């Protein structure tokens, strides 16, 4: 984890409130490209029972670390409505 110098918060919205968030989180962790790290995952209540998953993705500020790779991988997972980068910060 010490090699990483950036953290991006990626907000993932499930397709509906009935989605099993534990299963969805596990699937998303599996598809995270290997070169990226994961600091933590939080759950954010939105409205009407819908809960977003917030992935704190670790990366390096160098060529080859394109967050679009993470977004595309996440968007391909079943029951994912959307995946967007909320913030990017240096660490």
Curated annotation (Swiss-Prot):
Family designation: Belongs to the EF-1-beta/EF-1-delta family.
GO molecular function terms attached to this record: translation elongation factor activity
Keywords: Elongation factor, Protein biosynthesis
Pfam families with a match to the protein in the record: EF1_GNE (PF00736)
Superkingdom of origin: Archaea
Protein name: Elongation factor 1-beta
Function summary: Promotes the exchange of GDP for GTP in EF-1-alpha/GDP, thus allowing the regeneration of EF-1-alpha/GTP that could then be used to form the ternary complex EF-1-alpha/GTP/AAtRNA.
Entry's transmembrane regions: none
Biological source species: Thermococcus gammatolerans (strain DSM 15229 / JCM 11827 / EJ3)
């Amino acid at each position: 984890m010490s090699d990483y110098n950036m953290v991006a918060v990626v907000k993932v919205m499930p397709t509906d409130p009935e989605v099993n968030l534990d299963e969805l989180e596990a699937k998303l962790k599996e598809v995270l490209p290997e070169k990226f790290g994961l600091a933590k995952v939080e759950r954010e209540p939105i409205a009407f029972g819908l809960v977003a998953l917030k992935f704190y993705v670790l990366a390096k500020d160098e060529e080859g670390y394109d967050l679009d790779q993470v977004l595309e991988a996440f968007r391909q997972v079943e029951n994912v409505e959307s995946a967007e980068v909320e913030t990017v910060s240096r660490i």
